[in-house]
């Protein structure tokens, strides 16, 4: 997993609320288990509309999505996180996230940043008025900067540390590989092996 400390990039204003995981990545894209190749399926039904914000060339290099409230509702679908990442997003800013999506995002290195609705509105407006405006998501300082504001956000210390170290569940486990191997070496051969 790629480490996340501080990221500065352009932002896409997605003025939609209650965006569920089926809208993020429709089910026909879920036939694979690799984590790459899902960018083309991101919001694919909405992208059929020429006026959809991701079709605007001004947002082509955006790496931060600024969404409405209740982003990532619906089924638990890691593919939704993979699609956002494969498209190039490093962070999603919203007034509220579905708990399961938030957990999947944090577990895969996509930073979900929850900010007050008024702050999200300010950031969306800034990105609409000037698509080249840059937003900084600073995980070390736990704040978002841009559009003339500095907005703090909350994230527990352990999750913050994991993201800054680039550690998913497997990476965290592998930090103890020597201990695991040592433990396995002392177990009788007839017992199941963890390595």
From Swiss-Prot:
Swiss-Prot/TrEMBL keywords: Amino-acid biosynthesis, Branched-chain amino acid biosynthesis, Leucine biosynthesis, Lyase
Gene behind the chain: leuD
EC category name: lyase
Catalytic activity: (2R,3S)-3-isopropylmalate = (2S)-2-isopropylmalate
Designated name of the protein: 3-isopropylmalate dehydratase small subunit
Cellular component GO terms, alphabetical: 3-isopropylmalate dehydratase complex
Pfam families, per the entry: Aconitase_C
Keyword Phosphoprotein in annotation: no
EC number in record: 4.2.1.33
Subunit description: Heterodimer of LeuC and LeuD.
Native source organism of the sequence: Frankia alni (strain DSM 45986 / CECT 9034 / ACN14a)
PANTHER family: 3-ISOPROPYLMALATE DEHYDRATASE SMALL SUBUNIT, 3-ISOPROPYLMALATE DEHYDRATASE SMALL SUBUNIT 2-RELATED-RELATED
A Gene Ontology biological process term: L-leucine biosynthetic process
Protein purpose: Catalyzes the isomerization between 2-isopropylmalate and 3-isopropylmalate, via the formation of 2-isopropylmaleate.
Molecular function terms, GO-annotated: 3-isopropylmalate dehydratase activity
Pathway as given in its UniProt record: Amino-acid biosynthesis; L-leucine biosynthesis; L-leucine from 3-methyl-2-oxobutanoate: step 2/4
Family, per entry: Belongs to the LeuD family. LeuD type 1 subfamily.
Organism lineage string: Bacteria, Bacillati, Actinomycetota, Actinomycetes, Frankiales
């Amino acid at each position: 997993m790629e480490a996340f400390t501080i990221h500065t990039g352009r932002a896409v204003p997605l003025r939609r609320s209650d965006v569920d995981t089926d809208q993020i990545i429709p089910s026909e894209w879920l036939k694979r288990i690799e984590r790459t190749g899902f960018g083309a399926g991101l919001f694919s039904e909405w992208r059929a509309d020429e006026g959809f914000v991701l079709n605007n060339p001004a947002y082509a290099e955006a790496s931060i999505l600024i969404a409405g409230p209740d982003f990532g509702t619906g089924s638990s679908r890691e593919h939704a996180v993979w699609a956002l990442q494969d498209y190039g997003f490093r962070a999603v800013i919203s007034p509220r996230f579905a708990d399961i999506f938030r957990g999947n995002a944090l577990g895969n290195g996509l930073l979900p940043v929850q900010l007050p609705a008024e702050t999200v509105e300010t950031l969306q407006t800034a990105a609409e008025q000037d698509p080249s405006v840059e937003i900084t998501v600073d995980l070390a300082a736990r704040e978002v900067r841009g559009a003339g504001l500095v907005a703090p956000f909350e994230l527990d210390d352990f999750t913050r540390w994991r993201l800054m170290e680039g550690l998913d569940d497997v990476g965290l486990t592998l930090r103890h590989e020597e201990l695991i191997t040592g433990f396995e070496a002392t177990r009788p051969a007839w017992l199941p092996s963890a390595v």
